[in-house]
Amino acid sequence: YFKRHDGQAVTCDDFVDAMADANQKDLSQFKRWYSQAGTPRVKVEESFVSGTYQVTLTQSCPATPGQDKKEPFHIPLLYRLIGEGGNTEQLFELTEATQTIKVTGLTKKPVLSINRNFSAPIVLDFEQPESELLTLLKEDDDAFNRWEAAQKLFMRSILNGKPLDTELVTALKDILRNPDLDPAFKDLLFTLPAESYLYEQVSVIDPQAIHSARRQVRHQLATALQDDWLWAYQEHQTPGSYKPDAQSAGKRSLKNLALHMLADSGYAKVDDLASTQYQSANNMTDQYGALAVLVNFSLSHAEASLSNFHERFKSDALVIDKWFALQATRQIDFKQKQSVMQDVLNLRKHPDFNIKNPNRARSLIHAFCMNNLGAFHQPSAETYQFWADHVIELNHINPQVAARLARALDRWKQFAPNYQVHMKSALEFISKQTNLSSDVAEVIQKALNS
């Protein structure tokens, strides 16, 4: 590619042709990734009969405007069979609507690890049993699929409202303590699926049920591994001068996750740990990470640290944006001392808040309505009226910023009825306003007509 095109303006066809010629491979079907809209889905179905293991792969892609029917994509799928024989990684090229992988001469059904290293940007429809996901979590040598297995196990516990299995907790403990695994990978693996992603996995969204179940799973993870989180926090300190390299960054990420988990577990000394880290930090990651723990868990040093942070960085607009956003996205305390919305209303009166500044508006209003789903989605009209009032106010200041905020209720019809009624009322309230910008009017009408 560089030999042919260095210094030139080239097309996607030029790029693909260079790859094809270099590898002596026909990639004409692969170009459908450029010409067909949408994300392909691949359904995986398994069978194991009389020593023969068969995987049936079926690809599809939903209709999009102007493209009702899609031709099969060229989908490269890396896979490995975990079990007898320790099968090596292989590449399967899915080029037809349906194809099969067949392996004979086996005595036991293997565990399939597919789309390894995220070899294709697809949605994989594959309902593996929890026992097999646990095997992937413990034994797979592919980091992506190991992470994916953990995410699926976490998600099932959250959506089914059940605690984490004892065997899963033991496996997670072993992973956390494993010295051969990268700290950054551990940080990603232990981060639970976001509430917004969980919304996409259910037919009817009950935001408070999802929020509560997610909190409970994280609390179990924190308490069951409290000693291990303390070990992780102590083991991944980065003394000396600040280093921006990947290894140091990974240690900081895992250390801050460990601090968060210690707070969630109720560890008695976490207030002092977080306060000390905040005061001694020589980098923003550690200082902000400690501040986030103090604020999210309403620890005793939270207010003093917030004031100190503001005083220290008040001349740096981007950092003060983070300061506002942290308070707007504060998690709902189990004790529910004060609503986050009340915090946001109080912060609106802060001398550094200016709703006419797009970044500042996003750091507070958007952060609360779009990034703090557990606090925003309440079965009452209050938070939705707050949202509507700010969409209207921003409509007269910056229609583009208002239109982005207006999308917070795009999926209102998928929510439980006791939320829907208040969402619809808020949407209709906006739609009746005069002088709505075309940007905002389009978003609101599209939502109401969906």
Regions of interest found by a model, annotated:
Residues S35-Q36, I75-L77, L124-F126, L192:
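Generic structural "secondary-structure junction" signal
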Residues Y1-R4, V10-P40:
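Catalytic cores of secreted or luminal carbohydrate-active enzymes
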Residues D26-S35, T88, V123-F126, Y199-Q201:
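Short, charged, low-hydrophobicity "junction" segments
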